[in-house]
């Protein structure tokens, strides 16, 4: 029996790869209101998938996570000032193409969410937030940056996110892009073309 707070199966949100997961035979579950794959039985199940990631490579659909772009409004510096206000790590130290792990906190010091902050340009940042708190986080960011000269854009539904993990992750992805992945250091990223898709960002933040 479903509780009133549990979304009906038809109401579950879906990532752009949902149809592909189903065609490939994934076992789908309700993950925080999203219809997500928990395992692929044809691959041998959870233990086999775990071992594949530890010993080789695994690909995860994390498109349910949120993406918030913050850019300056009419004057330079507005985006940086806003990011400095809402996150704990010092974003002024980030070079363009660099990212860091950070946190958004309530005034009493408890967590709104943990985030990864990417510096896209001198006056542009991308915040990757967790799926379960996506709407809450976006509303909180909008509310707490009202006094800053910046533009807040929710890009969560505009992009598909894949996490490629394991010791062979670089080797796998290198076959799909002309970008030289060996030049991407930990917590750096670069724009690239992957599988012919030009509007792609490759980040080494795992």
PLM segments and residue spans:
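Basic, glycine/lysine-rich polyanion-binding surfaces/domains
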Residues: 1-206
């Amino acid at each position: 029996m479903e509780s009133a707070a549990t979304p009906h199966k038809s109401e579950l949100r879906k990532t752009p790869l949902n149809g592909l997961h189903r065609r490939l035979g994934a076992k789908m579950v309700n993950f925080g209101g999203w219809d997500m794959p928990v395992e692929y039985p044809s691959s041998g199940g959870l233990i086999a998938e775990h071992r594949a990631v530890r010993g080789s490579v695994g690909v995860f659909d994390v498109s349910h996570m949120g993406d918030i772009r913050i850019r300056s409004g009419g004057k330079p510096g507005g985006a940086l000032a806003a990011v400095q206000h809402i996150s704990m790590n010092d974003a002024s130290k980030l070079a363009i193409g660099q990212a860091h792990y950070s946190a958004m906190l309530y005034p009493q010091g408890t967590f709104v969410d943990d985030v990864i902050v990417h510096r896209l340009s001198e006056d542009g940042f991308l915040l990757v937030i967790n799926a379960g708190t996506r709407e809450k986080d976006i509303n909180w960011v909008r509310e707490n940056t009202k006094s800053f000269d910046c533009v807040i854009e929710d890009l969560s539904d505009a992009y598909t996110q894949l996490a490629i993990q394991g010791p062979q992750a670089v080797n796998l992805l290198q076959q799909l892009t002309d970008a030289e992945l060996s030049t991407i250091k930990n917590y750096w990223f670069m724009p690239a073309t992957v599988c012919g898709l030009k509007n792609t960002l490759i980040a080494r933040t795992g």
